[in-house]
């Protein structure tokens, strides 16, 4: 009956790769508190991890409707990333911009905006988003590849080489490294 206990069990089962049980406990939690933005966001994140993007988006939108939810910026970040997966670039951009308007210190949203801007050939904003991301987060294969590409576009050969070496050293077997080659 306790929504928090059911939500906690849902997260435990999700972490233990038991999606059916996780889904069951999320439903129990949401049956008790259907409008709880934290539960809606967590369930949306679970659905996203299950690659159920349409449904995840619905739950994120419900969570975002609560204007008093303190983690609303994260919900918009989740909505933006989900919209990217659904191929809705314009919607994704709007949601990520809203996320960053609410909280400028979100590495995931910054990296997504850097990628979007780079793909749209808006290289100066892309570099700005990327540099803000780099101040807040460690690099991963995806961000290093974007770093190489941005440095190349801005004719910063040393920086491009440095990012490329990090990509080779830290992520040699990744698709990003293959793209770099």
Regions found by a protein language model. Give the residues of each.
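Structural signature of tandem alpha-helical TPR/SEL1-like repeats
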Residues: 16-28, 50-62, 74, 86-98, ...
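Alpha-helical solenoid scaffolds that mediate protein-protein interactions
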Residues: 29, 63, 70, 99, ...
């Amino acid at each position: 009956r306790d929504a928090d206990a059911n939500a906690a069990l849902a997260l435990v089962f999700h972490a233990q790769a038991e999606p059916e049980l996780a889904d069951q406990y999320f439903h129990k939690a949401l049956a008790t508190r259907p409008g709880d933005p934290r539960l809606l966001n967590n369930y949306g994140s679970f659905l996203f991890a299950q690659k159920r993007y349409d449904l995840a988006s619905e739950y994120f939108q419900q969570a975002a409707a609560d204007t008093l939810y303190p983690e609303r910026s994260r919900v918009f970040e989740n909505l933006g990333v989900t919209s990217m997966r659904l191929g809705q670039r314009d919607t994704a951009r709007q949601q990520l911009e809203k996320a960053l308007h609410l909280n400028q210190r979100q590495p995931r949203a910054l990296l997504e905006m850097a990628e979007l801007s780079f793909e749209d050939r808006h290289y100066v904003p892309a570099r700005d988003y990327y540099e803000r991301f780099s101040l807040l987060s460690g690099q991963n294969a995806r961000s290093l590849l974007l770093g190489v590409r941005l440095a190349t576009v801005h004719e910063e050969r040393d920086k491009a080489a440095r990012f490329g070496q990090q990509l080779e050293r830290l992520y040699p077997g990744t698709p990003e490294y293959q793209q770099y080659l």
